[in-house]
Regions:
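Compact, glycine-rich, soluble single-domain proteins
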Residues: 31-154
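N-terminal signal peptide c-region/cleavage motif recognized by signal peptidases
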Residues: 25-27
């Protein structure tokens, strides 16, 4: 039996239509929503040092959890997440492997707490300069963020 053009068209539509409706009814993919970063800055050390620290506010406006699991920059040999804590009156720093940000919440990277540790700048950075640090998210996406070098907190 040979199909006439209108019958063939109807067959294609009736085959594809359920799949198109199914795809259209799917919830938005997590990739549609990204955390937002505000107030990103790097503290310029008083003297040339092989390490610097980066700070910012990371907000998750999405309906699903997000997590920062790493960072990188072309301006530094290594970038990692760290946390400073007071233990028995002594300030201790430890690396943080995963920084969760709950839906509708924010996390502050600030002096004396969570921060980005920036090791080995490839060239000296001056106050007012800007450089990009890319945050790596747990779902495999990358979030490039522009950081401004400052002598003190904004």
């Amino acid at each position: 039996m040979q199909m006439t053009p209108p019958t063939r068209h109807r067959s294609v539509v009736t085959t594809l239509l359920p799949w198109l409706l199914f795809a259209a009814s799917m919830p938005a993919v997590a990739g549609d929503c990204l955390p937002k970063v505000e107030g990103a800055w790097i503290r310029m050390p008083p003297v040339a040092m092989p390490m610097m620290a980066g700070f910012a506010r990371i907000e998750n406006p999405c309906s699903s959890p997000a997590a920062v699991v790493g960072a990188e920059s072309l301006a530094f040999a290594d970038v990692s997440l760290h946390e400073t804590r007071q233990e028995a009156g002594i300030s201790r720093m430890r690396e943080v492997e995963r920084l969760p940000v709950a839906p509708g919440k924010a996390v502050e990277l600030k002096p004396g707490g969570l921060h980005l540790m920036l090791h080995g700048p490839y060239q000296p950075l001056a106050a007012g300069e800007k450089t990009v640090i890319t945050l790596k998210l747990a779902d495999g996406r990358a979030l490039p963020v522009q950081f401004e070098v400052r002598k003190s907190a904004p």
